[in-house]
Amino acid sequence: MASILLRSCRGRAPARLPPPPRYTVPRGSPGDPAHLSCASTLGLRNCLNVPFGCCTPIHPVYTSSRGDHLGCWALRPECLRIVSRAPWTSTSVGFVAVGPQCLPVRGWHSSRPVRDDSVVEKSLKSLKDKNKKLEEGGPVYSPPAEVVVKKSLGQRVLDELKHYYHGFRLLWIDTKIAARMLWRILNGHSLTRRERRQFLRICADLFRLVPFLVFVVVPFMEFLLPVAVKLFPNMLPSTFETQSLKEERLKKELRVKLELAKFLQDTIEEMALKNKAAKGSATKDFSVFFQKIRETGERPSNEEIMRFSKLFEDELTLDNLTRPQLVALCKLLELQSIGTNNFLRFQLTMRLRSIKADDKLIAEEGVDSLNVKELQAACRARGMRALGVTEDRLRGQLKQWLDLHLHQEIPTSLLILSRAMYLPDTLSPADQLKSTLQTLPEIVAKEAQVKVAEVEGEQVDNKAKLEATLQEEAAIQQEHREKELQKRSEVAKDFEPERVVAAPQRPGTEPQPEMPDTVLQSETLKDTAPVLEGLKEEEITKEEIDILSDACSKLQEQKKSLTKEKEELELLKEDVQDYSEDLQEIKKELSKTGEEKYVEESKASKRLTKRVQQMIGQIDGLISQLEMDQQAGKLAPANGMPTGENVISVAELINAMKQVKHIPESKLTSLAAALDENKDGKVNIDDLVKVIELVDKEDVHISTSQVAEIVATLEKEEKVEEKEKAKEKAEKEVAEVKS
């Protein structure tokens, strides 16, 4: 396993978060000075207050790790950036350390691909957790029983009118947003990750509000797919250039049907189950809980904090954090803090994925199997104190982290945010989470309120759903404006050197002749110190990622490979099977309390499931037809390349990229070297496509070294995923034997 060399701990800048609005700032929150947690300040924590913008130099630490899977802790070589600050000053509360500091800027790495759980999976986890606590006799959150006051007839009529009013408003706004996004897709524009998530939720809402749309929209879409491909050729990449018109038609039909089936399955997983016995208590409990935290100042119970903290998932939290909060988290995790908001979120997302995978691997081996240096590396990667503490303290805080993340299922983003606030160590984990939730924006609370209703199977409040949709749409529009401003600034920088403006002269004045500057030899100062310059890496832009995608598509066409389509179809079948198994497990869990008859799948979900199963059969037929035609020789030959061979040489990849569009030779060479991880001169096309799809979802520019890290990470993720699948298979076999 690769050893880890943390060359220096100097200058790890603690984070600065903005104070939360409209409520009192608790101790340890970003509004107040934070206590240092470095080793040299262990005895000064109660008497020296230092703001977040500085830190104390500490001794370098050299760490190593054992086992191949811990290699994801390996950090890339640092480049120190000097940030000029004001000198040390004294204030009424003590000394404020504001001086020059060295900020280590590192590249990021990621771990196993974490797919978001569907609403059904979240409901299943919630049910299993409740039943497990009931069996073990542990604490289960149970809201106090309240006397239900029967509403008057007029109040019930008014509430029903409001419900339908907000429902029709939601239907109209969802239709407008869906039509706009669909038009963008038809015209060849790609949706960002945030836009795709919004589009997915809107489609799920439309089918929930009007279940009959499944009979109208889905068959209509399938029928018009060939027409849409003809009218809007930009829907698919322009790489379907084959010698056989039949092959071109079949492959286009296969690609579009596969994407549509995957989208419909994602829509099914976004739909919630219906619980007829639900009384809307979960939504009300969450509103009361958040009101206690934000307004009244009343402390919720530990069960409430742990229960509702699970709703603030990493994606939801990171997408709605402000820029100062994103910068603070990047500094805490020693990531690059300069760049667009999308780039910062992308870095944080990849780092959180890495931490999630590491947590599972550490828990499998056991914290006691790690030595001191490995413990320091693990704690430092999670924003916890790593120096100046005992070995028992390191093991204790790492065990507490694993318990909160893996057993209590607290999202990693909340745990990292609590470390960024540098709260006192005497606070309990529940109090730390409470202080962290106070700093989250209001939009996160709206999204979580809708999520808790979906997980519990309650009727979603149309007003809350409407507010969450409008806030998310406003955030998407703000991202578009930021991208437009960034493009304009880049264009302005390109034209700036060409502008030469002459200095104006006063009328009637004669130009003065230029006099040579004479400087005495004794006054000339020479700096003999060598100039230190960081290594400049080749940056890959979004446009070049698209070029690389086109090149891969051409190579796949030349090799007549359907490996990608087959793999995606198998994943789709697994998703359908997992969804069906989750429904069966939910009924099994509910049978323990006799409530299985009250929970059922929505009508739209049932109809979409049948349609997806039909489309899977059609896709299987298309793939079989293409393979039979290739074997019979009816389609074009594979240009001398063996069919199904997906490994190409680096030279082939460079030539393919040259044919698509001109890119500098140096960048092509460095990019190809980054993709060739084991340096054998060969690259797997399918693995390359996975990397491109991962980066293409985000509108960010990355370096070639970061591309290499993604390639290595994806291979590591596959190994971890295989271990988990093998473990699940073994558990199922044991359960079948017992039954």
Swiss-Prot record:
Reaction catalysed by this enzyme: Ca(2+)(in) + 2 H(+)(out) = Ca(2+)(out) + 2 H(+)(in); K(+)(in) + H(+)(out) = K(+)(out) + H(+)(in)
Transmembrane segments: 209-229
InterPro entries named in the record: EF-hand-dom_pair (IPR011992), EF_Hand_1_Ca_BS (IPR018247), EF_hand_dom (IPR002048), LETM1-like_RBD (IPR033122), LETM1/MDM38-like (IPR044202)
Gene3D superfamilies in the cross-refs: EF-hand
Annotated positions of the N6-acetyllysine modification: K597
Effect of T192A: Loss of phosphorylation by PINK1
Residues recorded with modification Phosphothreonine: T192
All copies of domain Letm1 RBD, residue ranges: 252-537
Listed result of changing R382A: Loss of ability to complement growth defects and morphologic defects of mitochondria in letm1-deficient yeast mutant
Effect ascribed to mutating T192E: Phosphomimetic mutant. Increased rate of calcium export from mitochondria
Effect of R393H: In CONDMIM; uncertain significance
Stretches for region Disordered: 718-739
Effect caused by changing D358N: In CONDMIM; homozygous patient cells show abnormal mitochondrial morphology and altered levels of components of the oxidative phosphorylation machinery; loss of function in mitochondrial potassium ion transmembrane transport; does not rescue defective proton/potassium exchange in letm1-deficient yeast
Membrane topology summary: Single-pass membrane protein
This protein's GO CC annotations: mitochondrial inner membrane; mitochondrion
Example of a GO biological process term: regulation of cellular hyperosmotic salinity response
Assembly, per entry: Homohexamer. Can form 2 complexes: a major (300 kDa) and a minor complex (500-600 kDa). Interacts with BCS1L. Interacts with GHITM.
Described function: Plays an important role in maintenance of mitochondrial morphology and in mediating either calcium or potassium/proton antiport. Mediates proton-dependent calcium efflux from mitochondrion. Also functions as an electroneutral mitochondrial proton/potassium exchanger. Crucial for the maintenance of mitochondrial tubular networks and for the assembly of the supercomplexes of the respiratory chain. Required for the maintenance of the tubular shape and cristae organization.
Disease link: Neurodegeneration, childhood-onset, with multisystem involvement due to mitochondrial dysfunction: An autosomal recessive disorder characterized primarily by global developmental delay and variably impaired intellectual development with speech delay apparent from infancy. Affected individuals have hypotonia, poor feeding, poor overall growth, and respiratory distress early in life. Other features include visual impairment due to optic atrophy, sensorineural hearing loss, and neuromuscular abnormalities.
Protein name per the record: Mitochondrial proton/calcium exchanger protein
Source species taxonomy: Eukaryota, Metazoa, Chordata, Craniata, Vertebrata
Gene: LETM1
